[in-house]
Amino acid sequence: MKQNIKLGVIAALMLIVLTPVTSNAMHIMEGYLPVKWSIAWGVIFIPFFLVGLKSIGKIVKQDPKKKVLLALCGAFVFVLSALKIPSVTGSCSHPTGVGLGAIMFGPSVMFVLGTIVLIFQALLLAHGGITTLGANAFSMAIIGPIISFLIFKALKKKDGNNAMPVFLAAAIGDLATYTVTSIQLALAFPDPSGGVMASAIKFLGIFFMTQIPIAIAEGILTVIVYNLITENGEKSILENNDKGVKANEC
């Protein structure tokens, strides 16, 4: 437990130090993408969102208590993704937080939770935008969780410490998000001489200067929260939720 606390403090300090007081937008800001790309990413995103809604409905129907853990995973995404570092013009770097929910519930749940976070931040915090919601959701709420889930599933141990699989899942999922964002920006703004590939490499180079340390810090925080939930947190949260429901009924 003491080791977890120490690691948590270190990771939190890394995020605080790397995050300035002011920043611009989440991933790709409002109006930055050409209309055709905004529409295209929105169309691609919608089927994933519908699958996510169905998945959440199934989880809640099977075990209503899981709503608390779903909310916790959503809050984790909201808090981490609110920390921003200006990076490429029209975009920024930040933790994503989607790995935790993908590991615990599967990637489809994060299709919805990640999108809800993006909508709230676009409307309330002026981070990101509605016209770029499809593109931002595809990178952070879809690709990031899928990669995190696949890595955790491939590396997890049935009996043993899963700290490293969780760390790698969260960190690489974070980096995957920004790899996709770089490709999205490159498709919209190809290099005049080198085309899409050259543009993507440039975006990746700028993003990863800030994103690699952020991904490491996110991986550490995700391990700590995951351990707290799986070791004793889940039971405690569900029990507290039951008490709250009973109190309201009285």
Swiss-Prot record:
- Name a GO molecular-function annotation: cobalt ion transmembrane transporter activity
Q: Which gene encodes it?
A: cbiM
Oligomer status and interactors:
Forms an energy-coupling factor (ECF) transporter complex composed of an ATP-binding protein (A component, CbiO), a transmembrane protein (T component, CbiQ) and 2 possible substrate-capture proteins (S components, CbiM and CbiN) of unknown stoichimetry.
Asked if the Swiss-Prot or TrEMBL record annotates the protein with the keyword Membrane, the reply is yes
Please give, as recorded in its UniProt entry, the membrane topology of this protein: Multi-pass membrane protein
Q: Which family does it belong to?
A: Belongs to the CbiM family.
What are the recorded Gene Ontology BP terms? cobalamin biosynthetic process
The record lists its disulfide bonds as none
| The protein's name | Cobalt transport protein CbiM
Q: In which pathway does it act?
A: Cofactor biosynthesis; adenosylcobalamin biosynthesis
Transmembrane stretches, start-end? 33-53, 68-88, 100-120, 132-152, 163-183, 205-225
Name the HAMAP family on file.
Answer: CbiM
- GO CC terms for this protein? ATP-binding cassette (ABC) transporter complex
Where does this one sit in the cell?
Cell membrane
Q: What's its job?
A: Part of the energy-coupling factor (ECF) transporter complex CbiMNOQ involved in cobalt import.
Record's keyword terms, sorted = Cell membrane, Cobalamin biosynthesis, Cobalt, Cobalt transport, Ion transport, Membrane, Signal, Transmembrane, Transmembrane helix, Transport
What start and end residues bound the annotated signal peptide? Answer: 1-25
Q: Does the keyword Kinase apply?
A: no
